[in-house]
Amino acid sequence: MTAEKITQGTEGLNVPNEPIIPFIIGDGIGPDIWKAASRVIDAAVEKAYNGEKRIEWKEVLAGQKAFDTTGEWLPQETLDTIKEYLIAVKGPLTTPIGGGIRSLNVALRQELDLFTCLRPVRWFKGVPSPVKRPQDVDMVIFRENTEDIYAGIEFKEGTTEVKKVIDFLQNEMGATNIRFPETSGIGIKPVSKEGTERLVRAAIQYAIDNNRKSVTLVHKGNIMKFTEGSFKQWGYDLALSEFGDQVFTWQQYDEIVENEGRDAANAAQEKAEKEGKIIIKDSIADIFLQQILTRPAEHDVVATMNLNGDYISDALAAQVGGIGIAPGANINYETGHAIFEATHGTAPKYAGLNKVNPSSVILSSVLMLEHLGWQEAADKITDSIEDTIASKVVTYDFARLMDGAEEVSTSAFADELIKNLK
C-alpha cells in the first residue's frame, strides 16, 4: 500500500486507502491529547478495515512549536501543505500575546476560506450535565466562519483610522446615532449573499444526506435588518430556488396562512413532513437561546452567522457535558479543504500532566472519518466512547461529577477506548 494525497473530484473527495493527512499537534495539552487520539484513530481504522486502510500522519507546525522552530507562529509551509493535502487535524493553539497578531485559528480559517464551522452537539449517556434532559439535545450547528463581526475589520478608539471612519459615517452617510464618537472603537459587520448561500446550501444538503428533519436559520434580523435580516431572507430564497421539491419553508407556511388560512397551512406542513421534506424555519437568536434550554428537541440542523454561532455552539456544548467532549470542523464544501479540531483551549496548567479529556479531538477525528466516507471506523470510535463512559471509566473532568467513577489518565482513557472497540 502506497500513501497518497486526498484529491477533490467532481463528485467530492477522492480518498485513497492510505491517505496522507497533516496534523498540528497543538499547544499546551495538545501533545497529550493528540498522542491519545491518534492511537484510538489508528486502532479503529485497523479494526474496521483489517489492514486494508490506514492513515499516514504528516506533522505540520503551527503555534508555539512553530515559533520555537521557525520564528513564525503560522509558517507559510504549513498553509501550503494543508492546501495541497486538503484535510488536516489540529489540537488547540494559543494566540500569541502582542498587538497586531491575529488568532491562529482565525488565520487558518480565513487563509483556507473554511466557511463552515461544523459543530455537532449530542449527549453521551452517563456524561454529567446541568440540565434535566440532555438526551433531547441532538443538533448540528453550521456557523458561518469568514464574515460578520469576526471578519476582523476593526478600528481602535482614538486612532487616525477610526476618526476617518466616524467622520465618513457622520458626514457622508448621515449617521447620527454614534453616541460617543470621540471615544468609540468601530467594528464592521459584513454579511454577503454569497457567504450566506454557500453556508445554507451546505446545511440543507447535510440535512438531506443525514435524514435530518429541519434547518433553523438563527438571526437577529429584527434589529440588524440589512445584515442578519438579509441572512434570513437569502437563506429562505436559496432553500426554495435550489431545493424546492425537497423542502417546506415557514415563508411558504405564512403565505398559505394569508391566502387559505392556518388550518390549510398546518395541513401543508404536516403533508411535507410525512413526505420527508426538510422544514426550513427561522428563529431570533435570543429566543433560540431560550428554546435550546426549554425545548431543544424542536431544533435539528442550525445555520447561523459567526457571532451567534460562537455563542450557540458553546452554550449547547455546556448542556451535554462541556467543550471537553465537543467536536468541531472547519470546512469548505466547495474546494474540499477541511480542518478537524479540538474545540477547547490549550489549558497550559495541565500541559504534560496526562490528565485531560481527549474526547474533543477524538470526536473531531470521527467527523473527519465520516467526511472521508470511512463510516465503519467512525462508528467504532463513537460506540466505544459510549461504552467507556457508560462504564464510568473517565478522565478527571467527568469523574469529579459522577458517582462511582474510576478516574483515569489521558493515555489510560485512550487504552480503554481501544479495548472497547468492537
Swiss-Prot record:
Disulfide bonds: none annotated. The gene is icd. It is an enzyme of class 1 (oxidoreductase). Catalyzes the oxidative decarboxylation of isocitrate to 2-oxoglutarate and carbon dioxide with the concomitant reduction of NADP(+). It comes from Staphylococcus aureus (strain Mu50 / ATCC 700699). This is Isocitrate dehydrogenase [NADP]. One of its GO terms (biological process) is glyoxylate cycle. SMART domains: Iso_dh. NADP(+) binds at T94, H344, G345, T346, A347, P348, K349, Y350, N357, Y396, R400. Its EC number is 1.1.1.42. Its cofactor is Mg(2+); Mn(2+). It comes from the Bacteria. The record marks Y150, K220 as: Critical for catalysis. InterPro entries: IsoCit/isopropylmalate_DH_CS, Isocitrate_DH_NADP_dimer_prok, IsoPropMal-DH-like_dom.
